[in-house]
């Protein structure tokens, strides 16, 4: 039988690995699902090349952005660029939002400049969640019109709230903002989805997912219990 020390060590490793999870871009489809390199700009370590990446349609008059956050709190910058390598010329597409609570976060209406319709580029999510800036990108075809999320899919976790929150570190990652006015003016963007969305009615693993911390803690307790038998 494994010693109590080895079992506890395995449990602590599980807790550490799970608690350090970052975030997952769910829509549009990300360039990579790998989270270990998310601190690498501009796209979380993924190879950004619009001629090679598989692109998802994103509607310039309004489309949804959905992600899963493994942190208790994080600020999100939604930005876009027509640079074929995602190397620069990033524009802010939505005011910076602070998410409080682990789980799903969905913004149902994100717009981009109308002149981008018919072009390819990248939509990027940059997060400031207390352990450095994290990045994820999606290759997209910017198309005309708008596209609401499929029914019931763009909802926030039951423990998630959101509000607009300035973040100078994230603001420094863009050259201009398509939805923000000039200095001193107010944004015309809609309020964050969390102020109006209803929590997911789906089971936790399908809707908001189980909290990383609670899952890990349960695993550690089971391991310790097994060692004491």
UniProtKB/Swiss-Prot annotation:
Q: Where in the cell is it found?
A: Cell membrane
Needed cofactors: Cu(2+)
Q: How is the cofactor bound?
A: Binds 1 copper ion per subunit.
- Which key words tag this protein in UniProt? Cell membrane, Copper, Glycoprotein, GPI-anchor, Lipoprotein, Membrane, Signal
Q: Where does Cu(2+) bind?
A: 22, 71, 131
**GO cellular component terms, semicolon-separated:** plasma membrane; side of membrane
Name of a matching Pfam family: BIM1-like_dom
- Chain spans, region Disordered: 173-202
Lipidation sites of kind GPI-anchor amidated serine?
Answer: 200
User: What's the main place this protein lives?
Assistant: membrane
User: What are the Low complexity biased-composition ranges?
Assistant: 175-202
Question: Propeptide-annotated positions?
Answer: 201-229
Secretion signal span:
1-21
| InterPro entries linked to this entry | BIM1-like, BIM1-like_dom
Point out the glycosylated residues in this chain: 156
Question: What's the domain of life for this entry?
Answer: Eukaryota
Provide the topology term for how it sits in the membrane: Lipid-anchor; GPI-anchor
- Family membership noted in the UniProt record: Belongs to the X325 family.
Role, per record: Lytic polysaccharide monooxygenase-like protein that has diverged to biological functions other than polysaccharide degradation since it does not perform oxidative cleavage of polysaccharides. Acts as a cell surface-bound protein that functions in the copper-accumulation pathway. May also act as the major cell wall sensor that regulates MAP kinase-dependent hyphal anastomosis, the fusion of hyphal cells.
This chain belongs to the protein called Lytic polysaccharide monooxygenase-like protein X325
């Amino acid at each position: 039988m494994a010693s109590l020390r080895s079992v506890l060590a395995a449990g602590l490793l599980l807790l550490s690995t799970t608690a350090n999870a970052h975030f997952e871009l769910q829509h549009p489809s990300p360039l990579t699902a790998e989270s270990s390199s998310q601190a690498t700009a501009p796209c979380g370590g993924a190879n950004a090349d619009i001629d090679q990446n598989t692109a998802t349609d994103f509607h310039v008059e309004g489309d949804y952005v959905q992600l899963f956050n493994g942190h208790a709190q994080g600020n999100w910058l939604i930005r876009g660029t027509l640079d074929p390598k995602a190397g620069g010329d990033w524009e802010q597409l939505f005011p910076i939002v602070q998410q409080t609570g682990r789980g799903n976060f969905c913004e149902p209406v994100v717009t981009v400049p109308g002149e981008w319709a018919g072009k390819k580029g990248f939509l990027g999510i940059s997060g400031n969640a207390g352990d450095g800036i994290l990045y994820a990108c999606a290759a997209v075809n910017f198309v005309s019109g708008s596209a609401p999320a499929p029914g019931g899919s763009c909802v926030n976790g039951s423990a998630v709230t959101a509000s607009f929150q300035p973040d100078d570190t994230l603001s420094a990652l863009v050259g201009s903002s398509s939805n923000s006015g000039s200095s001193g003016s107010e944004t015309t963007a809609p309020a964050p989805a969390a102020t109006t969305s209803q929590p997911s009615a789906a089971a936790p693993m399908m809707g908001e997912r189980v909290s990383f911390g609670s899952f890990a803690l349960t695993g550690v307790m089971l391991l310790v219990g097994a060692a004491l038998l």
